[in-house]
UniProtKB/Swiss-Prot annotation:
UniProt cross-references to NCBIfam families, sorted A to Z: rplN_bact
The keyword Chaperone belongs to this UniProt entry's keyword annotation: no
Keywords attached to this entry: Chloroplast, Plastid, Ribonucleoprotein, Ribosomal protein, RNA-binding, rRNA-binding
Protein name: Large ribosomal subunit protein uL14c
One GO location term (cellular component): cytosolic large ribosomal subunit
Annotated GO biological process: translation
Organism: Ipomoea purpurea
SUPFAM superfamilies reported in the protein's UniProt record: Ribosomal protein L14
CDD domains the UniProt entry points to: Ribosomal_uL14 (cd00337)
InterPro entries (alphabetical): Ribosomal_uL14, Ribosomal_uL14_bac-type, Ribosomal_uL14_CS, Ribosomal_uL14_sf
Gene3D superfamilies given in the database record: Ribosomal protein L14
Role this protein plays: Binds to 23S rRNA.
Amino acid sequence: MIQPQTHLNVADNSGARELMCIRIIGASNRRYAHIGDIIVAVIKEAVPNMPLERSEVVRAVIVRTCKELKRDNGMIIRYDDNAAVVIDKEGNPKGTRIFGAIARELRQFNFTKIVSLAPEVL
């Protein structure tokens, strides 16, 4: 469960290392975001000499959360960290690689480009 002021790791090579959520895209009064939701975030830590810089406002899709994700078949998935992938206005990732495992539910939300770049889909 991601809410405003939550810090997230970045799971791609776009140049950002850490994000802070400032808004959840969707309904006007949503409190929490889960896997597959789009957030507006500010870059808190960035790699030097990369296109994305610190204090830049970006959109990102959440790919991992510490909060459990319960599937219809009864399986429960929990990750060790909160992570997101930086995306553009069309929903395509800004980076060319994805690090770490991501949830299969992203395919249902039409993030097929992110799923195809991921090394492991759980």
